[in-house]
Amino acid sequence: MAIVGLGTDIVEIERITAHVARSGDKLAKRVLTDAEFDIYQQHSQPSRYLAKRFAAKEAAAKALGTGIGRGVSFQHIHIGNTPDGAPTIDFTEGAQQRLALLNGVVGHISIADEKSYAIATVILESR
């Protein structure tokens, strides 16, 4: 296997918290898939959850080489978790098409946060 994409993004959690305070769930509905939005609504720290998902999806879009736009939407990237809590990444629609163009078959993701920031790194591998 070879690495065909690498992306990293960092988000200031307070910036997301302020956006949610101003605009309610507007950003969450734009960024999160339906399954992610359900978790967001039940989460004990929804702004922190949203910041981590935002960073993860931006990192994934960078790894795909497109950023958000150019056929890749936030909705085309789903961040989940294994039963043990490790993050997972899945691609659909435009993101899946872009991954195929790179001959990519699997994405690896790491997400971390501390008091003020959320950061994510995505590595895409080919066959």
From Swiss-Prot:
Keyword Repressor listed: no
Q: Which reaction does it catalyse?
A: apo-[ACP] + CoA = holo-[ACP] + adenosine 3',5'-bisphosphate + H(+)
Keywords of the record: Cytoplasm, Fatty acid biosynthesis, Fatty acid metabolism, Lipid biosynthesis, Lipid metabolism, Magnesium, Metal-binding, Transferase
Q: Which InterPro entries match?
A: 4-PPantetheinyl_Trfase_dom (IPR008278), 4-PPantetheinyl_Trfase_dom_sf (IPR037143), ACPS (IPR002582), Ppantetheine-prot_Trfase_dom (IPR004568)
- List the SUPFAM superfamilies hit by this protein, alphabetically: 4'-phosphopantetheinyl transferase
> What does the entry give for GO biological process?
fatty acid biosynthetic process
Leader sequence range is none
The Swiss-Prot or TrEMBL record lists the needed cofactor(s) as:
Mg(2+)
| Record keyword Lipid biosynthesis present | yes
Q: Which GO terms of the cellular component aspect does the record hold?
A: cytoplasm
Q: Which residues hold Mg(2+)?
A: D9, E58
**Any idea where this protein resides?**
Cytoplasm
Please classify the protein's predominant subcellular localization into one broad category: cytoplasm
- Which GO terms of the molecular function aspect are on file? holo-[acyl-carrier-protein] synthase activity; magnesium ion binding
**Pfam families attached to this UniProt entry:** ACPS
The EC code for this enzyme is: 2.7.8.7
Instruction: Report the protein's function.
Output: Transfers the 4'-phosphopantetheine moiety from coenzyme A to a Ser of acyl-carrier-protein.
Q: Which family does it belong to?
A: Belongs to the P-Pant transferase superfamily. AcpS family.
Name the UniProt record assigns to this protein: Holo-[acyl-carrier-protein] synthase
**Species, as recorded:** Shewanella sp. (strain ANA-3)
* Gene it is expressed from: acpS
